[in-house]
From Swiss-Prot:
Residues 1-21 form the signal peptide. Belongs to the CLCR family. Induction: Down-regulated in oral tongue squamous cell carcinomas. It holds the Pfam family VWA. The translation product is autoproteolytically cleaved by the metalloprotease domain in the endoplasmic reticulum into a N-terminal and a C-terminal products that remain physically associated with each other. The cleavage is necessary for calcium-activated chloride channel (CaCC) activation activity. The keyword Transmembrane applies. Glycans are attached at residues 75, 340, 504, 542, 588, 628, 811, 832, 837, 852. Zn(2+) binds at residues 155, 159, 166. It is a single-pass membrane protein. The record marks 697-698 as: Cleavage. This is Calcium-activated chloride channel regulator 4. One of its GO terms (biological process) is proteolysis. The gene is CLCA4. Residues 870-893 are annotated as: Disordered.
Length: 919
């Protein structure tokens, strides 16, 4: 992802804050530059293209009406796999690739579960990552279960573009309303239907009334909500867009604040329409007075990769070993990273530019060696970036009349006052510019080039032991190559050693990789002693030593052995800087490798605004849980901040166990560029695959009520959501690019960061006490320890949300906060209870740090005290077992709630729900 600073291009860049790879623009009410990518694993079927066009066209009209004539789809690019046959209609893509996909058409995440979903791991109101549709869904084979694809696309689009959430909750499909009835979680509450148990076996089906679980006092897990086929209710698209009458989003009038929907949980009980109407899209448009035109489609077919290296050999590259380090990284790129079949050329530049290699198609090591021989050897002259770029365009143009989709890989360590003069040419070229900035002085204008062309931007310091240059080049794999063909980094580390010390460690090669495994060693002064053993203890020899470039490398033939590889490197100079990089490719094209993708939530930021680090670990589209994930954030002065990333659903992490590991970053040390690198390690019996459907998936409709009878849809394949597959040991590293921070004051930084919001507050009951549990926040967001907690209760959700300080306070004298990310528990006993038929108690927490900074109000936990009113026959005799929580005896406090009306007649049953507020 390209980065930028607002010096030369302040007016252009001031709105481009978020680290989002999408190119979608809103222009005169129409969404432009939407990219829909068909995954290479999808078998060729031209009907898929036809159905995509039909889906978007239908969706455009539906979206236009649903948004009060504000938005429609203007133009869409469909990216077709390279392995599909040629067609005269297909053009070569420009910046469109998998990295910039807004919609991905791919096989289901889990076999047989064609569930559409939107990948979201940020807060309410923030854009999602991408939409995932399956081929069968687009081909209309799942219409009964999910509704027409056009309406479904609008449902998912609202996730993607406006950051709203579903108005149902499969984890809490029912709730007890204030009316004392059990209701299906939905919006609006006016959607009618029946709650039934419907099971089929053999050729017969049985329908019966739902039974109440004696523990939860809600319907059992086998109960489902079957909507009436004929409805009059118009809302909501984020509940069941498949209902014919539904044409609107829930608004303030129709929104159901009682339901434990994900929209309520994540969006502070605001309606979906309220979130949408507060978006920049909404604020910057007015309703149209005429119907919109139909969408325009571009059919683009992936073709062979074309890349030209544009390398700085100016005089400044002679300092700090920069030229040699660039050559080491470029050789690694040419030897290992760039894929077979790619076309590669090379240009050098200083005050002028020189074509060194015209495009060569890589078929074997011969072409790779030819290109390596052309790397620069002597630094001299000034810096003319535009000369280098123009010569790269010339190299590409000699073989291809159009530059569309070709890549320019530009490395420079200097500024060029004339670089901005070729920005328009770059923008119009159709080429992609990747920029590696080496050192503090690298040019700002080129950052803008990478941004507008869809390229990547990396910052690399002069601290060789951080291995930043090799990491940056290694991250520049093709954006459109099948994942099985991509080079994956298993290890990247370095040390500066004294007294001829050793650098010893291990590298794990798991069974998902092993093909084209490549070990690279670099040094600063003298070749080290190198020893490498495979998992069986066999020593690996025959390293190729390149004394000129101060590197040695070894390619493992065939598929490398699975297991732990050990290495010993002994420095022969004092001091000495050594690095090791290990890369590999998928062992089997039919088994997706484990991957790590890292990013920041923003590309540009200003103090004191916090940033968030994200690292997503997947095997295919299935999340990997239980990994140890560490982020390394390096500033321009070489200082590295180390953060443990967590997938615990607390602090910066939006969803627990979704394979996205997150953490706040606030340890700014200076103004300027920072780089991100992530290391992930999964140990045996700790890392595992979570075999559960993806989050934020569209609601599956089990069937319809037609003329009073249930017409069932085919049942979904059953998956035990607690099923997990334990993974073997694995290791991965990944570069997350660069970001820019400004307005950082002199150190030490003032304390401006409150504790992070508690988002996982839970309430249960033990005997006569209410037990609260949550994840501890820190003194500064999720670091350190808070000073104290304030717990308040109310009979009204909105009172806690809007007037927390006026609600009744619980005595927390005995509550001693723990370190951030620890589990907290606290028990209190409600007293002086008055009697009514049924009452809800809502509970929320604020945290206060040592500087008296206060967190946002937590999510709101709800307990309900009531007398069961169901007939004894409706009580399920075999309720779902739930563990009895044990209260923390040190955290036991009474609370006088005489002003709060609770209900108790006879025996009291307390049931918990979890709601949320994000103020």
């Amino acid at each position: 992802m390209g980065l930028f600073r607002g010096f030369v291009f302040l007016l252009v860049l001031c709105l481009l804050h978020q680290s989002n790879t999408s190119f979608i623009k809103l222009n005169n009410n129409g969404f432009e530059d939407i990219v829909i990518v068909i995954d290479p694993s999808v078998p060729e079927d031209e009907k898929i293209i036809e159905q995509i066009e039909d889906m978007v066209t239908t969706a455009s009209t539906y979206l236009f009406e649903a948004t009060e004539k504000r938005f429609f789809f203007k133009n869409v690019s469909i990216l077709i796999p390279e392995n599909w046959k040629e067609n005269p209609q297909y053009k070569r893509p420009k910046h469109e690739n998998h990295k910039h996909a807004d919609v991905i058409v791919a096989p289901p995440t889990l076999p047989g579960r064609d569930e559409p979903y939107t990948k979201q791991f940020t807060e309410c109101g923030e854009k999602g990552e991408y939409i995932h549709f399956t081929p069968d869904l687009l081909l209309g084979k799942k219409q009964n279960e999910y509704g027409p694809p056009g309406k479904l696309f609008v449902h998912e689009w609202a996730h993607l573009r406006w950051g709203v959430f579903d108005e149902y909750n499969e984890d809490q499909p029912f709730y007890r309303a204030k009316s004392k009835k059990i209701e299906a979680t939905r919006c609006s509450a006016g959607i009618s239907g029946r709650n039934r148990v419907y099971k089929c076996q053999g050729g017969s089906c049985l329908s019966r009334a739902c039974r109440i679980d004696s523990t939860t006092k809600l319907y059992g897990k086998d109960c489902q909500f079957f909507p009436d086929k004929v409805q009059t209710e118009k809302a909501s698209i984020m509940f069941m867009q498949s209902i014919d009458s539904v044409v609107e989003f829930c608004n303030e009038k129709t929104h159901n604040q009682e339901a434990p929907s994900l929209q309520n949980i994540k969006c502070n009980f605001r309606s979906t329409w309220e979130v949408i109407s507060n978006s920049e899209d909404f604020k910057n448009t007015i309703p149209m007075v005429t119907p919109p035109p139909p969408p325009v489609f571009s059919l683009l077919k992936i073709s062979q990769r074309i890349v030209c290296l544009v390398l700085d050999k100016s005089g400044s590259m002679g300092g700090k070993d920069r030229l040699n380090r660039m050559n080491q990284a470029a050789k690694h790129f040419l030897l290992q990273t760039v894929e077979n079949g790619s076309w590669v050329g090379m240009v050098h530049f200083d005050s002028t530019a020189t074509i060194v290699n015209k495009l060569i198609q890589i078929k074997s090591s011969d072409e790779r060696n030819t290109l390596m021989a052309g790397l620069p050897t002597y630094p001299l002259g000034g810096t003319s970036i535009c000369s280098g770029i123009k010569y790269a365009f010339q190299v590409i143009g000699e073989l291809h009349s159009q530059l569309d989709g070709s890549e320019v890989l530009l490395l420079t360590d200097g500024e060029d006052n004339t670089a901005s003069s070729c920005i328009d040419e770059v923008k119009q070229s159709g080429a992609i510019v990747h920029f590696i900035a080496l050192g503090r002085a690298a040019d700002e204008a080129v950052i803008e080039m990478s941004k507008i062309t869809g390229g990547s931007h990396f910052y690399v310091s002069d601290e060789a032991q951080n291995n930043g240059l090799i990491d940056a080049f290694g991250a520049l794999t093709s954006g459109n190559t099948d994942l099985s063909q991509k080079s994956l980094q298993l290890e990247s580390k370095g040390l500066t050693l004294n007294s001829n010390a050793w650098m010893n460690d291990t590298v794990i090669i798991d069974s998902t990789v092993g093909k084209d495994t490549f070990f690279l060693i670099t040094w600063n002064s003298l070749p080290p002693s190198i020893s490498l053993w495979d998992p069986s203890g066999t020593i690996m020899e025959n390293f190729t030593v390149d004394a000129t470039s101060k590197m040695a490398y070894l390619s493992i033939p065939g598929t490398a052995k699975v297991g732990t590889w050990a290495y010993n490197l002994q420095a022969k100079a004092n001091p000495e800087t050594l690095t090791i990089t290990v890369t590999s490719r998928a062992a089997n094209s039919s088994v997706p490798p484990i991957t790590v993708n890292a990013k920041m939530n923003k590309d540009v930021n200003s103090f004191p605004s916090p940033m968030i680090v994200y690292a997503e670990i997947l095997q295919g589209y299935v999340p990997v849980l239980g990994a140890n994930v560490t982020a390394f954030i390096e500033s321009q002065n070489g200082h590295t901040e180390v953060l443990e990333l967590l997938d615990n659903g607390a602090g910066a992490d939006s969803f627990k166990n979704d394979g996205v590991y997150s953490r706040y970053f606030t340890a700014y040390t200076e103004n300027g560029r920072y780089s991100l690198k992530v290391r992930a390690h999964g140990g045996a019996n700790t890392a595992r695959l979570k075999l559960r459907p993806p989050l934020n998936r569209a609601a599956y409709i089990p069937g319809w009520v037609v003329n009073g009878e249930i017409e069932a849809n085919p049942p979904r394949p059953e998956i035990d959501e607690d099923t997990q597959t334990t993974l073997e040991d694995f290791s991965r590293t990944a570069s997350g690019g660069a970001f820019v921070v400004s307005q950082v004051p002199s150190l030490p930084l003032p304390d401006q960061y409150p504790p992070s919001q508690i988002t996982d507050l839970d309430a249960t009951v033990h005997e006569d006490k209410i037990i609260l549990t949550w994840t501890a926040p820190g003194d500064n967001f999720d670091v350190g320890k808070v000073q104290r907690y304030i717990i308040r209760i109310s009979a009204s959700i909105l009172d806690l949300r809007d007037s927390f300080d006026d609600a009744l306070q619980v005595n927390t004298t005995d509550l001693s906060p723990k370190e951030a990310n620890s589990k907290e528990s606290f028990a209190f006993k409600p007293e002086n209870i008055s009697e009514e038929n049924a009452t809800h108690i809502f509970i929320a927490i604020k945290s206060i740090d040592k500087s008296n900074l206060t967190s946002k109000v937590s999510n709101i936990a709800q307990v309900t005290l009531f007398i069961p009113q169901a007939n004894p026959d409706d009580i399920d005799p075999t309720p779902t077992p739930t563990p009895t929580p044990t209260p923390d005896k040190s955290h036991n406090s009474g609370v006088n709630i005489s002003t709060l009306v609770l209900s108790v007649i006879g025996s009291v049953v307390i049931v918990n729900f979890i709601l949320s507020t994000t103020i």
